Amino acid sequence: MGVDQLVETIIPYNLRSIATHLYVPPFTIITAIWTYVWLNIFGYEEYYELGMLGYAAIFVILALVLLFCHWMMPVRCFLMCSKQEDVRIASHVCVIPTQNNGWPELVKLMRTTRDKQTKLWFEFQRVHYTWDEESREFQTKTLDTAKPMVFFQKSHGFEVEEHVKDAKYLLGDNKTEMIVPQFLEMFIERATAPFFVFQVFCVGLWCLEDMWYYSLFTLFMLMTFEATLVKQQMKNMSEIRNMGNKTYMINVLRGKKWQKIKIEELVAGDIVSIGRGAEEECVPCDLLLLRGPCIVDESMLTGESVPQMKEPIEDVEKDKIFDIETDSRLHVIFGGTKIVQHTAPGKAAEGMVKSPDGNCICYVIRTGFNTSQGKLLRTIMFGVKKATANNLETFCFILFLLIFAIAAAAYLWIKGSVDETRSKYKLFLECTLILTSVIPPELPIELSLAVNSSLMALQKLGIFCTEPFRIPFAGKVDICCFDKTGTLTTDNLVVEGVALNNQKEGMIRNAEDLPHESLQVLASCHSLVRFEEDLVGDPLEKACLSWCGWNLTKGDAVMPPKTAAKGISGIKIFHRYHFSSAMKRMTVVAGYQSPGTSDTTFIVAVKGAPEVLRNMYADLPSDYDETYTRLTRQGSRVLAMGIRKLGETRVGELRDKKRENFENDLAFAGFVVISCPLKSDTKTMIREIMDSSHVVAMITGDNPLTACHVSKVLKFTKKSLPTLVLDEPADGVDWMWKSVDGTIELPLKPETKNKMERKAFFNSHEFCLTGSAFHHLVHNEHTFLRELILHVKVFARMAPKQKERIINELKSLGKVTLMCGDGTNDVGALKHANVGVALLTNPYDAEKAAEKEKEKKAKIEEARSLVRSGAQLPQRPGAPGAPPAANAARRDAPPGARARAPLPPMANAAQARLDNLMKELEEEEKAQVIKLGDASIAAPFTSKYTSIASICHVIKQGRCTLVTTLQMFKILALNALVSAYSLSALYLDGVKFSDTQATIQGLLLAACFLFISKSKPLKTLSRQRPMANIFNAYTLLTVTLQFIVHFSCLLYIVGLAHEANTEKAPVDLEAKFTPNILNTTVYIISMALQVCTFAVNYRGRPFMESLFENKAMLYSIMFSGGAVFTLASGQATDLMIQFELVVLPEALRNALLMCVTADLVICYIIDRGLNFLLGDMF
């Protein structure tokens, strides 16, 4: 049964006792049968090794079954549990989450009894699910908030303590406690992962082959890597835990009295009093603001540095149903945010709660992990384990390699079994080693490093990611969608002027020349609020108020400039109907006192989309449509204004009237024309994205004509093709495409069914869809929409839900989508896109960062000079807690500076200054740790800067990660295939490597494996796009053909080695390793082939640094290659003795070097040739 966005399915189970686990009877019977066969049919003494091998095989299979129970929840449930139809008699439930929301878990079903009623519940990812008898399904018990506003306005909280207990019992308290597991617990969890278990199994096999050094070296490397990851995971979890709210006391209304309780004791339904508190005091949970407006810093949740204004619902229509989706932005204070300013509520209306301390009155609607902050914490917390590559592709690729390994192992077993004297135990061991060789120990480490390197690189660029598994998707992106306002254009809007009725000479560009009515609308119709010395609110409204020169005071009064004409008085705002994306307008009821009278004249001021206000005017200007259409075609944002004087009324009566009563019989007050300049680098970045083979589209809530103008400027649409707009017709029936200039009119769908003619229709026009047209196509012409949507470059007048639907439609067509928005209106689209990037509005961050860096450098320089003068460093160099900046100062310390005698009094001032500098630098280093505000609830990727250059960075890193993964698979596959041959055919010739040789080989190639994942992307995106997956003609062909070349080289060189090997002693596989010409030849050429594989298959440009630019990788290949050449040429005799090698004959040595050179050249030609023909080269 589907439950919610987090949980897909819940299946009830009962745990079986160990004796009744389904795997116990089969293995008991198999073990008994094998014992009988071995002892009574084969014979104990004659087939001792065979008997032990049988037991070993049974034990390994049993261990695998148990591990599969641990790894795979369906297997565990099938073998260890019995399914229950009735959840009420179940002991556990198997919880399967929705895609990308964690992993399945078998959780205990809890039972809590109260008042003779039993509550069935369980906890999954810190969310409580309770069994509901009526609906017969598990539900997250949250407060039902879909109630009329009057319910909340008249609420007085819990009047009886019993009701508090009931709410706590049903809905839970406000705890957001996170328990960080112990190191050992987390290490065991990682140590039972499939790859780790497999690697430990391989280490055991190598030990049986008497390769102790190599086995222990590999095991140490694996355990160190896993321990490092566990430590990092624990650190991350500790930081997440610290992000939770710190406890403090809060005023709550219970039993008709105000009392102080801890924030953890709050329950949904409480009434609280909250205001600006201490620095560390965050809002404890999600609150509905009942009385008293406030300004909130939401940067901890959204990352936005601009404070948000929150309005109380005390003046909202009583019958309006509260919708948490649409009303939360204006009326809900989210948990984890901070109130930076609040206004004491006014006189309480009848039935409303009075504030005990002048703070805001709020209603608790969500607590604990059900809050927005709780959801973000869970996203980060349960996203820790997601830093992996495509597991399905990895598994399939290993299966592909396993085919070769099985063939090699079968060859060895058949050939080896011919000789009856050979040990079957040794033969079986060698066959097992061949099968395991196709999964290199480096694979999981490499895949983790590739993703983690990209994470770190993005962090340095100010881009933070909560879902690392999405990084490779960025390399596969087909279409990039952008919001317009605030994303492509700046927030620094410019008011061009006001166009009035029949204004033939253009628009009024000076506010002083405006009619009084137009000024009144501009000055009063806004949601701005004064915060300290700044205005907080919509950038468009700030631009309008600034342009007309009026000044907003703290009491919602707007005062004219001192230079204003006589007779113009200030305006007091009494009631606001805030702007919403759905209604596309804002209405304000305000009042002013005419000169010489104390009576208040009330006015209604309305501002919004011209097409929405069109039917609200008492007298519509004749050129209304023509004027706003002409202005929007020029790329300007146009808002219509209307005003109406109200008759005599009282302030109290205003609140009782509905919005519709005010929005009619308006007088036209003009069109305010606003230009939205493009960001300085938007054109350059869009060109780079388009030049890198991506389709681009704009999804905006703005006017279609304005959006089409911007799309033409940015070359989303071609100037040579007409842009057709589909908008709602006047009759609502005849849907027609109309060109922006009005010269072309075409039917909705091309009448022809001929594919070529339809293709010509789509290719000869550019398309723009409006929100109403999109709604029509979704519900009436969905087949045509799927055909059309990939050709639409502009989506205008789109509501947030429609933006989300567009992304889902594109994904359903198999397109990998990227959405870039501002993180507020675009949350749904950002979440549903394969790659969602939220740009935060922090225009001064870059400058501040540069200033801080400058200050830091100055401090380091001052510290260095103090050290040179003899001041003593407060911490030893290289200490675990020492910041890099402190270490920079230490580098210039004179010898013995740390261990000097106590300083003379005259040096105390310098010493104190140095100590302070070091403390400041250390604090700065600590401040760079990621905080909750760095991540956003809006999107998987959050950029701290407003530039869409972030999109290019994300795509570059995505491509780099994809290509790195692909080249790693190629290299590891080739090495595994060569290894499989060496272990099979050559094993029968007596070829084996010593423990020392295997260890040295591992050490030499370890650096290559490390630096291959550290590749950095290029500074610009390439036109070519990387292949999206491992399984393609290029990869399979290049691996196969390169292996054939390697195989041929091995055969040729081994043949020469056999001829050069004068010692023709019979092969003794049990004998202790002794170096000879054959062993030495195979060891050197196998190492040489592996180095060649790295050199040939390193991808480099156009997606990442070339081999010559990646110095670390180049030097590691050169060092390994140099070591191989030295050994092959026989120049370092002592080194060869140390490596247990013999000096090769000159003819064999020369042949070997020539063969390796030929292998390198031929493999390079094969790889680049196939890439040119089948790959992503051109």
Curated annotation (Swiss-Prot):
Skewed-composition ranges (Low complexity): 870-904
Membrane topology note: Multi-pass membrane protein
Annotated segments matching region Disordered: 868-904
Catalyzed reaction equations: ATP + H2O = ADP + phosphate + H(+)
GO BP terms in the entry: dendrite morphogenesis; intracellular calcium ion homeostasis; transmembrane transport
Main location group: endoplasmic reticulum
E.C. numbers: 7.2.2.-
Function description: Mediates manganese transport into the endoplasmic reticulum. The ATPase activity is required for cellular manganese homeostasis.
Record's protein name: Probable manganese-transporting ATPase catp-8
Gene name of this polypeptide: catp-8
